[in-house]
Regions:
Chain A
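Glycine-rich phosphate-binding loops of nucleotide-dependent enzymes
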Residues: 1-240
Length: 240, 308, 315
């Protein structure tokens, strides 16, 4: 069964179509990468999927249920998790409490919550800073904290919006290992600029350009495709 | 009195209320529209206008007409200066943060009101109108010979009340002309549209803000000077104009001047007419609830783009 | 962490013990004042729950205080209900009014929320005046001594009154501390810190806010009902705008979002007004000056400043 099916999504901003008739289907256990040049509509598309933005047209099914009109918090409660492109955490609360807020909704009691939090922090290697205020973390650690908040919800679909943006090289390598760990039991939708990361972790890549799906295929296909290369001309992200 | 003449009287009295209210509320609308802040002390500037008008005419004791004429010019300027001072010393320092501005203007409200109580005292004092001829008004009745006019007892209005309506209309027209036609109005509208952009174009936004806050208070004070010969000056008289101005500004589409004037007419006239049928308290309850519901259910519709 | 918990226990336990012990040393006049302060601090705590912990600034809490006051007063004086039941009716009335106003007002935010709550409270005040035959309008009515028996205790007796005020204060204070440490309270704080994130973690933010309004209203109503029972008077002035401004003033002065702020704020403001009203009828001048001064120089309030400068562990 497909975890997420989006059909004919359209989003207009004052006559401009930021997302123009996008159809997308993500099967279970897949790591799907969403790439495209700046302004291609990636973040808008993810906004539609997570419910932060309303669709002008189209239909979204999640786990076989129509969620087009479902408010964002209910989508999350149904098993979506979302990490923000611009780090969005609770700065004055401790790292532990940040993850606890994410986990608590699904836990029966505080003891359960603590166990889930400890596990999530261990997976992103942040256990040693559990009692630090989130504001005092380095930028890279804050990004990892976001991911831990996503993981602690044991989501069916984890949406990661540019998770490696601003990370150091070593941190990116850690992140790739983390995705390989996550993919064991979670479907992932990954918006990513870094093509190295995409090549290493994605099963299928969707390329977005001018709000439309330009191409869809395996990482190798994408690299071979001339249209995609053209779309990226001027954006210096294609290294391979 | 028959119903017809009675209704006409209510309408005329309502028109006086509407005129004064339109002046007061347009001051509040101006401040909200351009500065995006809610001035809770607006009613106290109204009250100060009335109290200072009493003070000026009292000083001029022997010549009430001249005293009133001076008050009409000087008092709004005094109140505007005071408001400008409050803007520069308080509101500017908290960066016009919307919520903190409300708290600060609540503080200003109490300061103005209580200082008035300490100096002017708790009494209500009248101001003599400069002229006050009673004008009897005709009504028609159907007789066997067709329609004929007669002068029902009690159906009358004073020349002063008519003058208030005229003066308010004149001032509002002047305000509209300043906003639309003058360079100052252009700068104000630019500041209203986009503060950052206005700054970039070299418009002295801070001075515009101080001026607008002063003008807003000055309009309230002017309305109060006009109304004080009809209604006495008292240190607690600011509450009602504040509440009514809120209602008018919200119905009129926050910050829009023509909308505010229209809403003031609607509220002022219906206030006079409704109180013929309902108790004034019930009318106030309904108006308050109506406005709250408007804010709750039609925020975009009323304000254009969501401003509050 | 553990040492902070100990310090907290020591400080708050100390404050409660001191409040309890005060009654044995205070002269009669101040004895009555402190009882009044504890009831008003309960009102302030109800306000702080919403303003300090959810960042919702209401300008209409008097309607909740009055709902408790009149709910109790009418039940006890007109319907012949016993005082304890009257108290419960008062709290329930506050909760219901809170649910209705909350459900409507929460559709707005920021300045519109402030104005909508102000308008609803004004309507509430006018409604009390309109039904003057029952409420006696501005004049208000006295609750007879026979109606002020609480399980045999005569609430008009100063010492029993002090105990009652102290009990209500303690229960409210401890429930708020417990609430803040519960998952519910932690979620409220998360919503205050970053509402958008809380939504994207699957929380129904509106529901949490509505519950917070209802709790806040019920606590304010508890204070109102207690005030009526302890001091034997129910009047419309308690529903006026001034009584919506007071809790804002107290909480701003004491420190929004601090546990002890409401008590500290009420204490200082009460005595400031008490002293100045001995000197002039224009005693509300003090309130105005304090409001302006706080927004300009100390937006965090007394306890907030203490927390910022000295005791970071204060809740």
């Amino acid at each position: 069964m497909s975890v997420l099916v989006a059909k004919g999504l359209i989003r207009q901003f004052n006559g401009l179509r930021a997302v123009d008739n996008v159809t997308l289907e993500i099967p279970e256990q897949q790591v799907r990468a969403l790439i495209g040049p700046n302004g291609a509509g990636k973040t808008t598309l993810v906004g539609l999927l997570s419910g932060r933005l309303a669709c002008s047209n189209g239909r979204i099914d999640f786990l076989g249920r129509d969620i087009t009109k479902v408010p964002p918090h209910k989508r999350i409660a149904m098993g979506m998790a979302y990490t923000f492109q611009i780090t969005s955490i609770f700065p004055s609360l401790s790292v532990h409490e940040n993850v606890a807020i994410a986990a608590r909704r699904l836990c029966r009691n505080e003891k359960d919550t603590r166990a889930v939090v400890a596990d999530a922090l261990k997976r992103v290697s942040l256990a040693h800073v559990a009692n630090t205020d989130a504001a005092d973390l380095s930028y890279g650690h804050q990004r990892l904290l976001e991911i831990a908040m996503g993981l602690s919800q044991s989501p069916r679909l984890l949406i990661l919006d540019e998770p490696t943006q601003g990370l150091a090289e070593g941190e990116v390598a850690e992140f790739i290992k983390l995705i390989h760990d996550i993919r064991q039991n979670t479907t992932v939708l990954l918006i990513e600029h870094n093509m190295d990361v995409v090549m290493q972790v994605a099963d299928v890549v969707t390329v977005l350009n001018h709000g439309q799906v330009l191409f869809e295929g395996t990482p190798a296909d994408v690299q071979a495709n001339i249209e995609v290369q053209t779309a990226y001309l001027g954006g210096a992200h294609v290294k391979a | 009195m028959d119903f017809g003449p009675y209704l006409m009287l209510a309408t005329l009295e309502g028109a006086v209320t509407a005129a004064v209210l339109a002046l007061t509320a347009s001051g509040l609308a101006l401040v909200f529209g351009i500065m995006r802040v809610v001035n809770v002390a607006h009613g106290e500037f109204f009250m100060l206008g009335a109290v200072l008008a009493w003070w000026v005419t009292d000083l001029m004791g022997a010549t009430p007409v001249l005293g009133f004429a001076i008050a009409l010019v000087v008092v709004p300027l005094m109140v505007a200066a005071l408001a400008t001072f409050a803007d520069m010393t308080i509101l500017k320092r908290i960066n016009y943060d919307p919520e903190r501005t409300i708290v600060a203007t609540i503080g200003i409200l109490y300061i103005l009101q209580q200082v008035t109580l300490m100096t002017y005292g708790p009494d209500a004092r009248p101001v003599t109108a400069p002229f006050n001829t009673r004008l009897a008004l005709p009504w028609f009745e159907r007789t066997e010979d067709g329609i004929s006019l007669y002068w029902p007892w009690g159906l009358s209005i004073t020349s002063y009340k008519l003058a208030v309506i005229g003066a308010a209309g004149g001032v509002l027209l002047g305000l509209w002309a300043v906003m639309k036609r003058s360079r100052l109005g252009l700068m104000m509208r630019a500041t209203e549209q986009d503060r950052e952009m206005a700054l970039a174009f070299g418009i002295p936004v801070e001075r515009i803000y101080a001026l607008v806050f002063g003008m807003g208070a000055g309009l309230a004070a002017l309305a109060a000077v006009l109304v004080v010969p009809i209604q006495q000056a008292h240190y607690l008289m600011g509450g009602d104009p504040l509440l009514l101005s809120f209602i008018v500004v919200i119905i009129g589409g926050l910050g829009s001047l023509p909308g505010t004037v229209l809403a003031a007419l609607l509220i002022g006239l219906s206030d006079g007419i409704i109180s013929v049928f309902f108790s004034p308290t019930l009318a106030k309850i309904l108006a308050t609830l109506l406005v709250a519901m408007l804010l709750v259910f039609r925020p975009q519709g009323m304000f254009g783009e969501r401003r509050l | 962490m553990r040492r902070d918990v100990q310090k907290n226990l020591l400080l708050h336990g100390g404050v409660l013990v001191a409040l309890f012990a005060l009654q044995f040393v205070l002269p009669a006049y101040h004895h009555g004042n402190v009882a009044r302060i504890m009831v008003l601090a309960t009102y302030a705590m109800g306000y702080n729950l919403l303003f300090g912990y959810v960042d919702l600034l209401s300008l209409g809490h008097a309607v909740f205080f009055a709902a408790g006051l009149y709910g109790m007063g009418i039940a006890v004086s007109h319907l012949g209900v016993s005082a304890p039941l009257g108290l419960m009716i008062g709290v329930l009335a506050g909760g219901v009014v809170g649910a209705i106003i909350g459900a409507l007002a929460l559709r707005t935010e920021g300045v519109a929320f402030m104005i909508v709550t102000l308008m609803f409270a004004q309507a509430g005040y006018l409604i009390i005046l309109y039904f003057g035959e029952i409420t006696r309008g501005d004049e208000g009515f006295v609750i007879q001594q026979v109606d002020r028996l609480f399980f045999g205790g005569d609430l008009s007796d100063p010492f029993i009154r002090y105990y009652a005020a102290f009990t209500v204060f303690c229960i409210s204070f401890l429930s708020i501390l417990a609430l803040l440490h519960s998952p519910f309270g932690k979620t409220l704080i998360a919503i205050r810190e970053n509402q958008e994130r809380a939504v994207m973690l699957g929380y129904n933010v509106m529901r949490f806010k509505l519950l917070a309004v209802i709790f806040s209203a019920a606590l304010s109503a508890l204070a109102g009902a207690t005030y009526g029972l302890l001091f034997g008077y129910v009047g419309a002035s308690f529903a006026s705008v001034q009584y919506s401004i007071f809790p804002l003033l107290w909480v701003l002065l004491g420190g929004a979002g601090t546990a002890l702020g409401p008590l500290v704020g009420v204490f200082f403001m009460f005595y400031l007004i008490d002293i100045s009203s001995g000197m002039t009828t224009a005693y509300m001048l003090v309130a105005g000056v304090v409001l302006v001064g706080l927004t300009l120089f100390a937006p965090q309030g007394l306890m907030g400043e203490i927390r910022r400068r000295f005791w970071r562990w204060l809740p």
